[in-house]
Amino acid sequence: MRKQKNETVVLKKGKKDIELDYAELRKAVLVLRAVNHKLRQQIIELLEENEKMTVTDLYIKLRLEQSVASQHLAILRRAGVVATERQGKFIYYRVDKERINHISRLVEELTENTGN
């Protein structure tokens, strides 16, 4: 059975039920999967250190093929971890801190409610 976007997930913990928004949970899982990769973690660190960078800046700094850097940036972008900004012919990538903070709060809430 496939969950609808407006449904909730109920976790049982003893006599206590924990209700979670299914759509928010899916978004959190997407972000966690995206950042659970060494290279993508390095990309995030570089972007945090430099505020914003082009794909060229990133692949030179990380000594990667351009296509590899682009693929990993696309995964991070789809997950909402990084955002893009066009300046002339250049596209700059930056960490979307608001999105990261939102997911972080959701994960904290989940771990508090499940007692882990």
Spans of model-derived segments:
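Amphipathic alpha-helical dimerization/coiled-coil segments
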Residues: 2-28, 48-49, 97-116
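N-terminal helix-turn-helix DNA-binding core of bacterial DNA-binding proteins
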Residues: 26-67, 87-99
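Alpha-helical residues within the helix-turn-helix
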Residues: 60, 77-78
